[in-house]
């Protein structure tokens, strides 16, 4: 599609910076939500062009296109945008997270002490027969089957 070079460069810069691009499947939208002043149609067509050359992978779900840069696409955009190799897309950067503290009874001083015996006490069978309230004759395969015939073609009704 014929589009101004500044629009194509803006699309490629955003794609390289983020590593991904999302666009709603709306060819008549006046502008793309992330790229101001650029029509959604131009974004979709530029990404389709990159997809046909194998520089991005495309996913489509719920009326939205999702494009992910491939390694070849990163190299192509570095050459096209004249970027040094030190600059990488946001998807390749490691996110720095603080060590998360695990919540639970392990770290709380006010939590009651538990042992393995306490946790498995509910699994044990009752010690007295009177306390046993489970039925042994329930479940699949425990009932006696009885075929009495029915309303079929071979036998009339009784």
Curated annotation (Swiss-Prot):
Xref: InterPro entries: Plectin_eS10_N (IPR005326), Ribosomal_eS10 (IPR037447), WH-like_DNA-bd_sf (IPR036388)
One GO CC term, this protein: cytosolic small ribosomal subunit
Subcellular localization(s) per the UniProt record: Cytoplasm
Source species of the chain: Spodoptera frugiperda (Fall armyworm)
A single MF term (Gene Ontology): RNA binding
Name listed for the protein in its UniProt record: Small ribosomal subunit protein eS10
Similarity annotation: Belongs to the eukaryotic ribosomal protein eS10 family.
This protein's record includes keyword Cell cycle: no
Top-level lineage group: Eukaryota
Gly residues composition bias: residue spans: 149-158
Keyword Signal: no
Gene behind the chain: RpS10
PANTHER family from the UniProt entry: 40S RIBOSOMAL PROTEIN S10, RIBOSOMAL PROTEIN S10
One Pfam family recorded for the sequence: S10_plectin
Region listing for Disordered, in residue ranges: 99-158
UniProt keywords, alphabetically: Cytoplasm, Ribonucleoprotein, Ribosomal protein
